[in-house]
Amino acid sequence: MSDEKNYGISLAAPARPDLGSRTASQLEKATASHVEFATPKDPGALHDATLMAGERTEKLTKFVVGLALFASVSGFCFGFDTGVISAALVSIKDDFGHILDDTEKEWISAATSCGALVGALSSGALADRVGRKWTLAVGDVWFTLGAIIICSSFSVVQMIVGRAVLGLGVGTAAAIAPLYIAEVAPTRFRGALVTVQSIAITGGQFFSYCIGIPLTGHNGWRIQFAIGIVPAVVQAAVVHFLPESPRYDLLRGQREAALATIHRSYKGMSEDYIAVKFAALEEVVGISADFNRGHTLGQKMRLVLTEGKYRKPAITALGIGIFQQLCGFNSLMYYAATIFSYAGFDNPTSVGLIVSGTNWFFTFVAMMILDRVGKRRILLSTYPGMIAGLALASVAFWKMTGSTGHRLVEGTEYPQQWSNMMLGMMVVFIAFYATGSGNITWTVGEMFPLEMRGIGASILAGGVWAANIVISATFLTLMNAIGPTPTFALYAGICLAGLIFIYFCYPEPSGLSLEEIQIIYNYGFGVQKSREIRAEHKLKAQEMRDRANSHIGGSATASDDQLNKV
């Protein structure tokens, strides 16, 4: 085709399953239509009338909600096992024969991030080999095994090993759960459903803080980690009964299974719409399958580095993920109880619950506005709030710690107005973080083409956890070396750099199909092209409404004329 060089794909029509004469006929017609609109003179015109009308009327089915909730159990385990360490570090006391120093606390915290990095980088290839849902089950095994090692720990080294094993599950959950949800979700609800994963993560963190309050006694931290085994075992037990992602089924030639899942996901939609949707997906997956057969894992990784349509989504995903971590949020998740203990609060774990609760609440806010407002707009609106919260927190630390050489010294009674301001500004920072970066980061795997989506999910999560290691392994050291004011000011500066990156390198994916997102990176970072396609969608939708209104009006006029004649 004349446009093949623009897209790097061949649009040969794939073979079709025996789906009955009616559906097969619809698929024949739909595929021809899809090939026509998939390679237009204007690459932004990607939808025919059936898809344009259908995607705006897609319904959220119980089946899809159930799949999202199932996958989000991994997110709950992720959140619980990263949040539980905050209270555990305070309650361990001398259970290992001595009081933990700051270096040991950093190693225990960072071990999970190290394991998560390995889990994230390996889980993408595993998901492409055994499937999305079974990779989540592998993550459950890591969650369970890690918790058992931790619960039986009687040394710092064993604790670190257990936390690293736990991290393998965290990395797997971070990479694959949002990928699975995005691939089963209707286009209209994809952003909101992926946010269910974020709600589960923050809910797990909040729950870990809640149970940390009563379990502060001797060996209470062992019970805290043991509780985290329960959701992992439950998810692993039911995974067999759930469907695979339709995209993965098609990649493995399970076309009837893929169509059955599409039918259940789009229940209530017309057969014509489902046929067009399936044909479009089938074609893109066929192209991806051809690609996968001709490329090894190493070759794919080289393509990410050398070919623009893969490199640019990788830069976008890595940038969003790295800035999410380097902003310092997880320093609060891991060390909130430690910070508030040093700041003189009587019950630091309870105060940490305010931080975690804020994060959870505003994750719900994000879910309600994500697809309506748009992910890019939300990020550009919330990053300034994050910067302001961190900058004012650094001012509060400066005023608060004047009597101790601008260092936090445990056991010091600091001025209440400044400690309260510090807490308030942390809450402001977290509110903006949870509404934007905390949620949207886990959706940017959708920016990768299907043939690279498993690798892309690993790249994203790998970048996130590499940056997380930097934060978790240096926070207490930074606080001791330069003090809290410069530390939080540094995080504010990193957020400013993140805001600039988002403005130039993050296109708006909301309202675009996963297949459309592949096209926009043929035009730089796709910021302007995404805007054009979305505007074109709105224009076409308005034209369709105008035609419908004109038809209704014409019918009404005809009826009036007939009535007048009578």
UniProtKB/Swiss-Prot annotation:
Where composition is biased (Polar residues), the residues are 556-566
The segments annotated as topological domain Cytoplasmic are 1-64, 128-140, 185-192, 244-313, 371-377, 443-458, 507-566
List the transmembrane segments.
65-85, 107-127, 141-161, 164-184, 193-213, 223-243, 314-334, 350-370, 378-398, 422-442, 459-479, 486-506
PROSITE patterns in the record, alphabetically?
A: MFS (PS50850), SUGAR_TRANSPORT_1 (PS00216), SUGAR_TRANSPORT_2 (PS00217)
Residue ranges, Extracellular compartment?
86-106, 162-163, 214-222, 335-349, 399-421, 480-485
Where located?
Cell membrane
* Region of interest called Disordered, as start-end residue ranges on this chain: 546-566
**A biological process (GO) annotation for this entry?**
myo-inositol import across plasma membrane
The UniProt entry's GO CC annotations, sorted and at most eight, read: plasma membrane
What's the protein's topology in the membrane? Answer: Multi-pass membrane protein
Q: Which UniProt keywords apply?
A: Cell membrane, Membrane, Transmembrane, Transmembrane helix, Transport
Gene Ontology terms for molecular function: myo-inositol:proton symporter activity
Q: Which reaction does it catalyse?
A: myo-inositol(out) + H(+)(out) = myo-inositol(in) + H(+)(in)
Keyword ATP-binding belongs to the record = no
Check the record and name the Pfam families matching this protein.
Answer: Sugar_tr
Keyword Transport applies: yes
- Stated induction or repression of this protein's expression: Expressed during growth on inositol and during sexual reproduction. Expressed during infection.
Q: What is the reported phenotype of gene knockout?
A: Simultaneous disruption of INO1 lowers hyphal density and leads to a severe sporulation defect and attenuated virulence in a murine inhalation model of systemic infection. Simultaneous disruption of ITR1A results in defective mating hyphae, reduces production of phosphatidylinositol and glucuronoxylomannan, reduces laccase activity, and increases expression of ITR1, ITR2, ITR3, ITR3A, ITR3B, ITR5 and ITR6.
Q: Which NCBIfam families match?
A: SP (TIGR00879)
The family annotation for this protein states:
Belongs to the major facilitator superfamily. Sugar transporter (TC 2.A.1.1) family.
What this chain does, per the entry, is described as: Major transporter for myo-inositol. Plays a role in the traversal of the host blood-brain barrier.
Put simply, this protein is called Myo-inositol transporter 1A
Q: What does the organism's lineage look like at the top?
A: Eukaryota, Fungi, Dikarya, Basidiomycota, Agaricomycotina
